[in-house]
């Protein structure tokens, strides 16, 4: 009984997309790239950041380019 009640209480409201329509995935857009990196500097998975597979591919390429150009750190060891 409880399972049926919990399933019906799910919100039907859609979550906002993580990338707005005007934003371009680019290695120079550091503020956008930082939203998709964990505190340790790892690239977040598609499930966590709710990107499409194409957006995730472009985001990964942009993050790796920014790391090579020293715009983003490879690891974030602030300890």
Curated annotation (Swiss-Prot):
GO terms for molecular function: small ribosomal subunit rRNA binding; structural constituent of ribosome. GO terms for biological process: translation. Keywords: Chloroplast, Plastid, Ribonucleoprotein, Ribosomal protein, RNA-binding, rRNA-binding. One of its GO terms (cellular component) is mitochondrial small ribosomal subunit. InterPro entries: Ribosomal_bS18, Ribosomal_bS18_CS, Ribosomal_bS18_sf. Gene3D superfamilies: Ribosomal protein S18. It is found in: Plastid, Chloroplast. Belongs to the bacterial ribosomal protein bS18 family. PANTHER family: 30S RIBOSOMAL PROTEIN S18 (PTHR13479), SMALL RIBOSOMAL SUBUNIT PROTEIN BS18M (PTHR13479:SF40). Part of the 30S ribosomal subunit. HAMAP family: Ribosomal_bS18. This is Small ribosomal subunit protein bS18c. It comes from Physcomitrium patens (Spreading-leaved earth moss). The gene is rps18.
